[in-house]
Amino acid sequence: FGGRVMGDGKPKYLNSPETKIFDKSRNLYGLNIARTTRKKYLILCEGYMDVISMHQAGFTNAVASLGTALTSGHASLLKRYTQEVLLLYDSDEAGIRAALRGIPILREAGVNSRVVDLKPYKDPDEFIKNMGAEAFEERLNQASDSFMFRVSIAEGEFPMEEPQGQNRFFERCAEMLLELKDELERNLYIEAIVKKYRGQY
């Protein structure tokens, strides 16, 4: 059993006690339906209500963790059904942090990831209600490469109008590039960063 409070009560999520059969870190809500989808990717959301809203709108390849952060167990489970996951967390600070935490976990499991930008809306339900399923599909298609998403977030952490801030930003980019073990992949991202920021700073 898994439940979510509809108001502001606590705890936000309430699940049955964990057993050998029910392990939150190795189960995904909606996977029983999503795994049969013909889409080439699965969409990872924050919670039950996101999945329900998306399935109602026709996006049946959406899943969510059971009120917990993404784990290596979740990533391994996703790997069994897809090579690519779209991270679709809320557009607030907590959602951004969750995406940043999830990217390396998925990468370690051998799953490619992209990040969907829902702004100016907070979550999938709000976006779909205001913009419709077609516009939502377009946002999915525009999902950012996960590495370049990290680069964009890093850019916002430094005073880019100052040379020192620019220097610290590019040092951060270099650190992230060194995390990439594959030389070809690293060179491709170097080119992508140069292309994006050439002439800006």
Task: List each language-model region with its residue ranges.
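Short, hinge-like loop/turn segments at secondary-structure boundaries
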Residues: 81-82, 103-105, 130-137
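Alpha-helical scaffold segments in soluble metabolic enzymes
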Residues: 33, 53, 77, 101, ...
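Acidic, metal-coordinating catalytic cores used for nucleic-acid/nucleotide bond scission
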Residues: 49, 70, 89-99, 117, ...
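Phosphate-handling DNA/RNA-contact segment within nucleic-acid enzymes
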Residues: 1-81, 85, 98-99
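Glycine-rich phosphate-binding loops that contact phosphosugars or nucleotide phosphates
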Residues: 74, 93-97, 101-108
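Histidine- and aromatic-rich ligand-binding microenvironments
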Residues: 84, 90-91, 134, 141
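C-terminal or mid-to-C-terminal helical accessory/interaction module adjacent to the motor/catalytic core
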Residues: 111-200
